[in-house]
Regions:
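A generic local structural motif
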Residues: 22, 94-97, 138-139
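Hydrophobic alpha-helical segments and helix pairs
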Residues: 78-125
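Domain-core and long-helix interface of multi-subunit machines
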Residues: 13, 105, 109-196
Length: 196
């Protein structure tokens, strides 16, 4: 089966085109399934929304309605699933579980971009020290252990701006992530950047 489950929309601020553009491209490329998994709009108490990372929470109903309308429109040509890409933010896991159930989502993926939140937390794509790698791995494994996620997205995110070839710390982190995924029966995505 040819499938992609990591598809963002223009609502997140770093994707372009319409939702339907993605569906038509997937059909043209012979995909059997397309999963939309825009970045989840966390309900931060202060209302913070990162302008180039995720949609505002007020956009969530329209996002879900759009994807579901496309699933109906293209039924028989491609199967379309509805989900979100999410970080492991312990303070929001209860909200995430409730939101998934209330909205009948098909899946969630673990895209472990930030430590704690995206307003004040460290962005794991800027990792440069062994301590930061350790935080990334610990957070990713804890997220996987919740059982809430279908797979681990771009597990090599910590290498994005690492600035040097994979060293002993990076190799140890990669091995630990692979071992955790195997132990938890968690698929890993291969998708980050053309430089790797």
């Amino acid at each position: 089966m040819k499938a992609n489950y990591h598809t963002h929309t223009a609502r997140c601020g770093h994707a372009t085109g319409t939702d339907e553009d993605y569906v038509l491209a997937a059909i043209e490329q012979g995909f059997d399934e397309l999963g939309f998994s825009d970045h989840v709009p966390w309900p931060y108490k202060n209302g913070y929304v990162h302008p180039t990372v995720r949609m505002h929470i007020s956009q969530m109903p329209e996002y879900l309605a759009s994807v579901r309308a496309l699933a109906e429109k293209y039924r028989g040509q491609i199967r379309i699933l509805t989900g979100f890409e999410c970080e492991y933010f312990p303070d929001y896991m209860g909200w995430l579980a409730d939101m998934k159930a209330e909205n009948g989502l098909d899946y969630l993926i673990l895209g472990n971009h930030y430590d704690h939140d995206d307003e004040h937390g460290f962005y794991f794509g800027h990792t440069s020290t062994a301590e930061q790698i350790r935080r990334y791995v610990d957070s990713a494994v804890k997220g996987m252990e919740t059982g809430m996620f279908a797979y681990l997205a771009h597990p090599d995110l910590f290498m994005r701006d690492y600035g040097r070839p994979l060293d002993a710390d990076g190799r140890a982190a990669a091995k630990e992530l692979c071992q955790a995924c195997k132990a938890l029966n968690m698929p890993m995505e291969y998708n980050l950047h053309d430089r790797f």
